[in-house]
Amino acid sequence: MVKVGIVGGTGYTGVELLRLLAQHPQAEVVVITSRSEAGLPVADMYPNLRGHYDGLAFSVPDVKTLGACDVVFFATPHGVAHALAGELLAAGTKVIDLSADFRLQDPVEWAKWYGQPHGAPELLQDAVYGLPEVNREQIRNARLIAVPGCYPTATQLGFLPLLEAGIADNTRLIADCKSGVSGAGRGLNIGSLYSEANESFKAYAVKGHRHLPEITQGLRRAARGDIGLTFVPHLVPMIRGIHSTLYATVTDRSVDLQALFEKRYADEPFVDVMPAGSHPETRSVRGANVCRIAVHRPQDGDLVVVLSVIDNLVKGASGQAVQNMNILFGLDERAGLSHAGMMP
C-alpha cells in the first residue's frame, strides 16, 4: 500500500485527489494539510467523502510527518512546493506537484510569467514533466514530477501526432481553448461568481497566458525545433471541462490523419481517438481521466482541425497526478482511474 500525503487539501484539485484516491486499491491517504483548516475532519468539509476519510483531519504541514509518506502531492498555489520539495526529496519521499512550480525548465522564464524568482532552481534538473503519453519511461524513475496544466494537456495531446510526424507547418499553430470556471480555482474571484460567469462567454489573457510557455516548451520537443503558437483561452459557463479547437496547416493531402492519430495513441489507456467525423463533448469526459480527440480536414483542404476535450480537474490535474503515481510505483496505470464520464 502506497502511503500518500497531500499538501493543500482544500482546493478543487485537492478534493479531486481525495475523491480519486478513495477508490484506489493500492493507495492510502495518511496526511492532508491545510494551515487554515487544521484540526477539521476532512469529511466535515467534504460531505461527499463521508465514509471514506472519517478518521482523517487536516493538519499543519510538517516535513517530518510528510517525509514518512511514500509520495506527497502538492495541490497548492505556485511557490509553495519550492519551499518544501527539497526537504521531502532529501528524506526519500517522492514528490508529485500539481502546481506550475517545476513545469518550466528555464527558471528565468518561470519568473517572467509568475512574477517572482524561482524558489528552487537547483531541483529543475530532477523534475520530470508528467505527461505520460510522452515521458512514461522517465516518470518510472523520477523523484520529482511536474504534473502538466489543463490547457497544456489538452493542447499537446491534440497537436503531438502532427508535430512528431513532421507534417505540419510548425510556424502557424493555433489553439482556441475553452475552460469551465473550476479552472480558476476555489478562491474568491469576481470573474468566477455565478452572476458574472453564467450566461456569458469571454476570452481572456489574449496577450499571454501563463500556460503558453509550458505548451510551447512541449511542442518544441515534439517538433524538434521552434514553433509558432497563438493560444487564446476562453471562460465558458460550465463547472468542469476543457475544449481545445486546434488548427494546423498540413499541405500533404495524402496523409491519412485518422490512421496517424489512431496509431499514435493505440497503446494509451487514457487517450480516446474517436471515429472520423466525430465531435467530442466535454460532458463525455466529466469525472474521467480521459482525453477524447477527433481530427478533421474541412473541405479536404490544407487546414487540419483537431478537437481535444478533457476534464480540467481529472486528466487536466488530479487524475493525471494519480496516473503518474501509478507509473512511478509500478502499479497498474489504470488503478483508481477507471471511472467513466458522467452523463448527463
Swiss-Prot record:
Transmembrane segments: none
Main location: cytoplasm
Annotated metabolic or biological route of this protein: Amino-acid biosynthesis; L-arginine biosynthesis; N(2)-acetyl-L-ornithine from L-glutamate: step 3/4
EC number: 1.2.1.38
InterPro entries: AGPR_AS (IPR023013), AGPR_type-1 (IPR000706), NAD(P)-bd_dom_sf (IPR036291), NAGSA_dehydrogenase (IPR050085), Semialdehyde_DH_NAD-bd (IPR000534)
MF terms (GO), sorted A to Z: N-acetyl-gamma-glutamyl-phosphate reductase activity; NAD binding; NADP+ binding
PROSITE patterns on file: ARGC (PS01224)
Pfam families on file: Semialdhyde_dh, Semialdhyde_dhC_1
Compartments where located: Cytoplasm
Keyword Oxidoreductase: yes
GO biological process: L-arginine biosynthetic process
UniProt-recorded name of the protein: N-acetyl-gamma-glutamyl-phosphate reductase
The organism of origin for this protein: Pseudomonas syringae pv. tomato (strain ATCC BAA-871 / DC3000)
Lineage: Bacteria, Pseudomonadati, Pseudomonadota, Gammaproteobacteria, Pseudomonadales
